Regions:
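Core segments of small alpha/beta cavity-forming domains
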Residues: 20-84
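Low-complexity, intrinsically disordered terminal/linker segments enriched in charged
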Residues: 114-118, 122-139, 147-148, 152-182
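Extracytoplasmic/periplasmic, Sec-exported soluble proteins
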Residues: 20-24, 42, 46, 132, ...
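Surface-exposed, charged secondary-structure patches
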Residues: 58-131
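Hydrophobic/aromatic beta-strand elements that line small-molecule binding cavities or substrate pockets
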Residues: 105-107, 139-146
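N-terminal signal peptide c-region/cleavage motif recognized by signal peptidases
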Residues: 12-16
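Bacterial N-terminal signal peptides that target proteins for export
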Residues: 1-7
Length: 182
């Protein structure tokens, strides 16, 4: 009986993995599930430990770009002996400096081996004595790439338009860090 159950589970596993690999929205949810516990650490460009946790949900291209940007930032920090703040500060995976506290995946458009998913994000600040925290709500777009291991986050398009938030694309910001600290 155990043998039969094992066979059924082994046969069902590739089907479940295949279904998830074909769904960009599931990949976006997987990313935010992993990242939601990481951005609270206040890290700008994720360090090696956080990048290791994020690696399964990010594309090989974005993983490499994050590692290269982290190395460039470390070179700058060493060169100026920590006298200047990091080139990038705050949450680099969303438009808002503080990052999201909740997300909901919207529509995804898929074309060939790329997909774009809009994500409704919100940030609720911790309550302070006697005041009710007002949430910030915005939408960003995650760009995904189809890899042999399934859909992976390949870039973030900052769509919120906040006066002091991130604008453009995550990949462009990382390229700026890399170029400014060769």
């Amino acid at each position: 009986m155990k043998w039969a159950l094992t066979c059924v589970l082994l046969l069902a596993a590739p089907v479940a993995a295949s279904a998830q690999a074909e769904d960009p929205a599931a990949a976006v949810n997987a990313f935010y599930s992993v990242y939601s516990g990481q951005h609270a650490q206040g890290l700008c460009i994720p360090d090696a430990t956080v990048r290791l946790r994020l690696q399964p949900v990010l594309s090989p291209r974005l993983n490499k770009q994050l590692a290269t940007a982290a190395t460039a930032q470390a070179r700058l920090t060493a060169k100026v002996k920590n006298a200047v703040p990091p080139v990038l500060e705050g949450d680099i995976f969303s438009s808002l400096f503080e990052g999201p506290t909740a997300w909901k995946v919207g529509s995804c458009q898929q074309k060939d081996k790329a997909a774009r998913c809009s994500v409704a994000l919100s940030y609720v600040p911790p309550p302070t004595a006697g005041t009710k925290a007002k949430p910030a709500n915005w939408t960003d777009t995650l760009v995904l790439a189809a890899t042999p291991q399934g859909w992976k986050v390949d870039d973030v398009v900052y769509d919120a338009g906040f006066a002091f938030g991130n604008t453009g694309r995550l990949s462009d910001m990382l390229n700026m860090v890399i170029a400014s600290n060769p």
